[in-house]
Every structure is written in C-alpha cells, then in structure tokens.
Amino acid sequence: IFDPVGAGVSSLRNDMTKEIVENYPLALIRGNMSEIKAITKLIDLDTENDSVAKGVDVAASDVISKDNLDINGAIVKALAKELNTVVIASGPIDIISDGEVIFGLENGDEMMPLITGSGCMLTTIIGSYVGANDPLLGGITACALMTIAGENAAEYVRENDLGTGSFRT
C-alpha cells in the first residue's frame, strides 16, 4: 500500500514517489486527488491534468465533486491501468479503480478533512482490509468503513456540542 503524501510538492517527494511507483509492485495507491494527479505527471501519463500541489492537503481545484467526478474518475482509472494496481483518490467522493471499473463512494462528513491525519488513518484501514482481501474489494470496504464511521463521529460531536478534538466513534 502506498500513500504518496505530498507528491507534487518537492523534488525529494517527487523523486521518491516516482521511484516507488516505477520500481516496486503495489497492491494499492491511496492519496488525495492532488497527489494522484502528481503521480500522473511524474510518470508522463497523458491525462487532462491541471493540478498544482499545495502541501499535504488537496488543492481547492482538486477537491472531488459531482462537477468534476467524470474527469477525476478517468484520471484515477488511467493511473490504475497504467500501473496495474488499485488506485483510490479520497475526498468528499472517494474514487476507486482497478483500471477496468470505477467506483464512487459518497459518504462521510465535511468535518473529516479538518481532522489531521484522516487520510493516513484511511490508508492504515485500507492496509488491514487489503491484507486479507482482493485489493479492489478491500479498498472499497475500507473507504466505506472510514466514511460511515466519520458520519457517526460527526453526529456525536454535533449532538454533544463538541469540537473536532472529540471526533471519534
């Protein structure tokens, strides 16, 4: 499982990301849409790609929405096909592809991106599920689990008038 944190931000991160995706077999790549687009640039994959990385957080123009779902889905699918792996772009709508099919999951809560490390938590859960399952099925299941847990945690926070530091289930 590879989480390309901050891909597209610095030459060090770009060089390491390129080396990993080109030289090591990966069961799955999970990143935000800016990180996924950065990988497509690094390997010269021909996609419509206007992303500008801005650190470890997704660029505002790369936040996955219904308006850009088709183009972002095509990018995720093309990268998965090119690298022969499962690719997950996480966001308000998670896009998951093995290069043949594309799935979109629209669960979660707008509070989730405010929790530092939520993407890393998702990658850890994905690792648990992919270790025991097909990478595509494991990735879908892990994303569903994380986003539904996020909905439950957000409900708890709102019902108890708490802040994001109490975001848990």
Annotate each language-model stretch with its function:
Residues 105-116:
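Short pre-catalytic strand/loop immediately N-terminal to key active-site residues, enriched for Gly-Thr
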Residues 33-35, 93, 109, 143-147:
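Glycine-rich beta-alpha junction loops
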Residues 148-169:
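Charged C-terminal helix
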Residues 38, 116-145:
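Short, small-residue alpha-helix embedded
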Residues 6-10, 95, 112:
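Short, small-residue-enriched loops and turns at beta-alpha junctions
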Residues 11-14, 33, 69-73, 120, ...:
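Electropositive phosphate-/nucleotide-binding environments in soluble metabolic enzymes
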Residues 11-102:
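Conserved phosphate/ATP/ADP-binding segment of small-molecule kinases
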Residues 1-4:
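Short beta-strand elements of ligand-binding domains
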